[in-house]
């Protein structure tokens, strides 16, 4: 077969724009099998199909309108947007807040840096994790940045314990949500954080079992950033390291690949890690690490267009920390 024809066939099969709303029942049965979905009753199955059909319609519209990204049926496709956000994100204002972190206003014009930069290429980013049904994105994003700080300083990748923060951070609310800077403050108050192997992830709230003798990372100081110019995040990323950021995750749920040019910003509900940036077909983009597993997006990552405040990425909830 002609190689060009073969490539076109592969592209057509792979591209989610090929979805047909009339085939929703067939897609749904495939979805049930692929993701091993089971429901308590036929009425619940019907309800889930109706949600699935609504999500499929949204996926088709997105694939028609967003020419630089692709969207697909995935493990969240039988959940409403509100369900996905409530179960799989977790950025929320704690009942009590503190202010240990120094506030830095990024109001100077950006420097002339490289067009592309990616901390993954320098082997300073740990593997993608999966928070599961626990609203602890705040813990994953903050500790992912500390993991990178440790790798930058000691040239060694180590996985830290999100479960320690979920169980022992009494400012944030465990699987019910938290913030980025308050998580850093909690690590400072506790004195450090253990490795994941010593305090494994359980995906639910538990009793604090912290062992100070097993701390592997200690935080010296934390910072909150107010970015006046989105472009300035490039300088911050290169100088500081991977940065946890707050976003609105509503539009990334059914993301598959490419650069998202349309991502709403109706309120922050999720935290992810900014690890790099680049340009593809003259479209500048940010690279972000998510916590929904490697079977989501671009092996757990996603890209959004720069300088349009995609998903609300430019906000006052940016944070980072300096380790000993």
Curated annotation (Swiss-Prot):
Cystine links in this protein are: 134-175, 168-208, 263-311
Q: Where is the signal peptide?
A: 1-18
Residue positions with a glycan: 159
Q: Where is the active site?
A: 137, 270, 290
Q: GO MF terms on file?
A: cysteine-type peptidase activity
Query: EC?
Result: 3.4.22.50
Q: Does the keyword Disulfide bond apply?
A: yes
Q: Keywords for this entry?
A: Disulfide bond, Glycoprotein, Hydrolase, Protease, Signal, Thiol protease, Zymogen
Annotated Pfam families = Inhibitor_I29 (PF08246), Peptidase_C1 (PF00112)
Q: Which SMART domains match?
A: Inhibitor_I29, Pept_C1
Q: What are the residue ranges of the propeptide?
A: 19-113
Function of the protein: Cysteine protease that plays an essential role in host liquefaction to facilitate horizontal transmission of the virus. May participate in the degradation of foreign protein expressed by the baculovirus system.
Give the protein name, as stated in the record.
Viral cathepsin
Source organism of this protein record: Hyphantria cunea nuclear polyhedrosis virus (HcNPV)
Query: Which gene does this sequence derive from?
Result: VCATH
């Amino acid at each position: 077969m002609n190689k060009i024809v073969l490539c076109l066939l592969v592209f057509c099969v792979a591209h989610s724009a090929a979805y047909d709303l009339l085939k929703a029942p067939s897609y749904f049965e495939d979805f049930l099998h692929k993701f091993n979905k089971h429901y308590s009753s036929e009425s619940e199955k019907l309800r889930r199909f109706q949600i699935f059909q609504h999500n499929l319609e949204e996926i088709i519209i997105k694939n028609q309108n967003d020419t630089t990204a692709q969207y697909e049926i995935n493990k969240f496709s039988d959940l409403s947007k509100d369900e996905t956000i409530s179960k799989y994100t977790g950025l929320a204002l704690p009942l009590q807040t503190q202010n240990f972190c120094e506030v830095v206003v990024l109001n100077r014009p950006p420097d002339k840096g490289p067009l592309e930069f990616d901390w993954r290429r320098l082997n300073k980013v740990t593997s993608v994790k999966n928070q599961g049904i626990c609203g602890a994105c705040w813990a994953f994003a903050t500790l992912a940045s500390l993991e990178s700080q440790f790798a930058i300083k000691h040239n060694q990748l180590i996985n830290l314990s999100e479960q320690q923060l979920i169980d022992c951070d009494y400012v944030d609310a465990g699987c019910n949500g938290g913030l980025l800077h308050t998580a850093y403050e909690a690590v400072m108050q506790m004195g450090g954080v253990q490795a994941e192997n010593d305090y494994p992830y359980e995906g639910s709230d538990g009793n604090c079992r912290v062992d100070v003798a097993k701390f592997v990372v200690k935080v010296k100081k934390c910072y909150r950033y107010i970015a006046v110019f989105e472009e300035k995040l490039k300088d911050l990323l290169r100088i500081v390291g991977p940065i946890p950021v707050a976003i609105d995750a509503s539009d990334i749920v059914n993301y598959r690949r490419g650069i998202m040019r349309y991502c709403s910003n109706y309120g922050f509900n999720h935290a992810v890690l900014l690890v790099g940036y680049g340009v593809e077909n003259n479209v500048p983009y940010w690279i972000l690490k998510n916590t929904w597993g490697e079977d989501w997006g671009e092996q757990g990552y996603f890209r959004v267009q720069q300088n349009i405040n995609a998903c609300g990425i430019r906000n006052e909830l940016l944070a980072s920390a300096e380790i000993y």
